[in-house]
Swiss-Prot record:
The protein's name: Arginine biosynthesis bifunctional protein ArgJ
Organism: Burkholderia pseudomallei (strain K96243)
Major localisation: cytoplasm
Tagged with keyword Cytoplasm: yes
Encoding gene, per UniProt annotation: argJ
Keyword match Cell membrane: no
Compartments, record wording: Cytoplasm
């Protein structure tokens, strides 16, 4: 059950000039469901992406990296993305790579572009051959129904164990020019930073130089999709793609030092964070949405390290599910996070506005009923004060329920 998942009105997902989306039902794994997505990008756009750090990365991730490397070396720009659900094309060896390249070649043939101008993506079951003929057979239909307003359908077409489609959109003004941003994401399990079994596609109509877009993609991922965790597993397929169509009247953003870049970065990060948080709210079996903030560190990295130790802990997550204020589990996670020279005698722990631990020990004024009150909420904030610096970091996570086990035990049935 999704946690306070906002209602998404398809009419509020703004079309992005220069970007069209089409879908098909190709029976990749299950019949009568959208499972192929094609995104077409007009000539002149720039595209960038960041991908999983899992060494067992899926075949389409390898091909995406190859094609983007050619673009950065001066090759023709990306003109299309193709996504299939139901099969990850991971753990499939050389045949999987051949299938990813064959998918690009077939879409390129149908669209009149070069295979190197296509980025492929897959999500679903690992270690099973991609049903390439079914995927290829679905491409003509996906191309035929492309439209600029198909963002909600596109969000549905990339779902796996997601219970709801995930999309976000906004318009901002930069230097007097209107910029439109719309994105979709998918993911509900195998969610951990760097990134997860997560796909995210975010388009906007600003014109951005390739090196600047590359920097923006990494920066935005680090402040959004790399700040979420559901179960601590890092997937083979995770990908986050930025598309800058260049159709807006705003002059090209050619430097990361410009005020226009700062404004765009803020807007893109806001949309990406919304998409990332939707993934956590729809986490497999999730009943609670939890924000973990660690403050007073020597660096943002050590703050994030502690935040993730809390967010990954099965004991912490099951305590949240049970509404059990067994909050010593949080202190234990802080202690094993691996931060050197951590003085636990300086640490304060808050649960929402309730001071649970002060100077490394139980707050004498803390009452368990106060902790119980917070633990029963569907949204909870954990705040840790380290008392050793000015850095901070925030992550978003969820609880761990019986349903998480059931969903993953039944995943292939």
């Amino acid at each position: 059950m999704a946690v306070n998942f906002p209602s998404i009105d398809p009419a509020q997902l703004h079309p992005v000039a220069g970007v069209t989306l089409g879908w098909a039902e190709a029976n990749i794994r299950k019949p009568n469901r959208k499972d192929v997505l094609v995104v077409s990008v007009e000539e002149g756009a720039t595209v960038s992406g960041v991908f999983t750090e899992n060494r067992f990365c899926a075949a389409p991730v390898t091909v995406c990296r190859e094609h983007l490397a050619k673009v950065r070396a001066g090759g023709a720009g990306i003109r299309a993305l193709v996504v299939n659900t139901g099969n990850a094309n991971a753990g499939t060896g050389e045949p999987g790579l051949a299938h990813a390249r064959e998918t690009c070649a077939e879409l390129a043939r149908l669209a009149g572009i070069a295979p190197g101008q296509v980025l492929p993506f897959s999500t679903g079951v690992i270690l099973e051959p991609l049903p390439i003929e079914r995927l290829k057979a679905g491409l003509p239909a996906a191309l035929a129904n492309r439209a600029a307003a198909n963002w909600h359908d596109a969000a549905q077409a990339i779902m796996t164990t997601d219970t709801l489609p995930k999309a976000a959109s906004r318009q901002v003004t930069i230097d007097g020019h209107t910029i439109t941003l719309t994105g979709i994401s998918k993911g509900a399990g195998m969610i951990k930073p760097n990134m997860a079994t997560m796909l995210g596609f975010l388009a906007f109509d600003a014109k951005v130089a390739q090196p600047v877009l590359d920097a923006l993609a990494k920066d935005v991922a680090d402040h959004s999709f790399n700040c979420i965790t559901i179960d601590g597993d890092t997937s083979t397929n995770d990908s986050f793609i930025l598309i800058a169509s260049g159709k807006a009247s705003l002059p090209q953003i050619a430097s990361t030092d410009s005020p226009a870049y700062a404004a765009l970065r803020e807007a893109v990060t806001a949309v990406a964070q919304a998409l990332a948080q939707l993934i956590v709210r729809d986490g497999e079996g999730a009943t609670k949405f939890i924000t973990v903030t660690v403050e007073g560190g020597k660096s943002a990295a050590e703050c994030r390290q502690i935040a993730y130790a809390i967010g990954h802990s099965p004991l912490v997550k099951t305590a949240f599910y049970a509404s059990d204020p067994n909050l010593g589990r949080i202190l234990a996670a802080i202690g094993y996070a691996g931060v050197a020279d951590l003085d636990v005698g300086k640490i304060d722990l808050y649960l929402d506005d309730v001071l649970v631990a002060k100077a490394g020990g139980r707050n004498p004024a803390y009452l368990e009923e106060d902790g119980q009150r917070v633990m029963k909420q569907s949204e909870i904030a954990v705040r840790v004060l380290l008392g050793r610096g000015d850095a901070q970091a925030t992550i978003w996570t969820c609880d761990l329920s019986h349903d998480y086990v059931s969903i993953n035990a039944d995943y292939r049935s």
